[in-house]
Amino acid sequence: MVVLIPVYWYHYGPTNFLYFCDIALLLTLVGMWLDKPLLISLPAVGILLPQALWCVDFVVQLCGFTMTGMTSYMFDETKPLFLRGLSLFHGRLPFLLLFLIFKLGYDRRALKGWTALASSLCLVAFFFLPKAGATLADPNLPRNVNYVFGMDDAQPQTWMGAELYLVTWIALLVILVYLPTHFLLKRICPTPEQAAAKRA
């Protein structure tokens, strides 16, 4: 993080830290530092499945094909290789979170907490940040943060109206990502109390 934060800030600007994955990384580090299960559980319920999709999409693009377009930036040769290499934390973070969840326990409050946080981030990205395909003075600045305009940063989706897509996107995240992850973690992971008793 000592390297990643200043490098990302310089190249991508502060709005880059509004991506779910970057918020998740920051929460994970603070959670590790403070030994707080809730701070680990929040990103776990929110990004375990999306980061798995990121990994699959990256491998597909590495093989010369396109799946969702969400990792296209990793193959953008206008961006320094070192900068793109820093983004490989996406592939490691899910495994770290799983390790920490089993160690510290899964806090059931994470579902409501992450849903509120993610919804707020989506609204900020939709109303205040550049949309997909926007022409910016600095081409490195983030567009389409958290995919609120579609899965491709190069152009907005055209399946439905932008506002309807936003509402649908948030609903799908809750129904298809956060809820299943919550129930899975609730089933297979200890509670913070159980984890603490086991460590004692």
Language-model segments: residues:
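Membrane-embedded alpha-helical segments of multi-pass membrane proteins
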Residues: 17-30, 88-93
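Alpha-helical membrane segments in multi-pass integral membrane proteins
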Residues: 86-92, 111-133, 139-146
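Membrane-interface capping segments at transmembrane-helix boundaries
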Residues: 180-199
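Short, aromatic-rich membrane-interface segments at the entry and exit
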Residues: 13-20, 38-43, 110-113
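Membrane-interface transmembrane-helix boundary segments in multi-pass integral membrane proteins
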Residues: 133-178
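Short, hydrophobic transmembrane alpha-helix segments
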Residues: 5-14
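Aromatic-anchored segments of alpha-helical transmembrane domains
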Residues: 1-6, 48-57, 118-130
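Membrane-proximal helix-loop-helix units in multi-pass membrane proteins
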Residues: 45, 49, 53-118
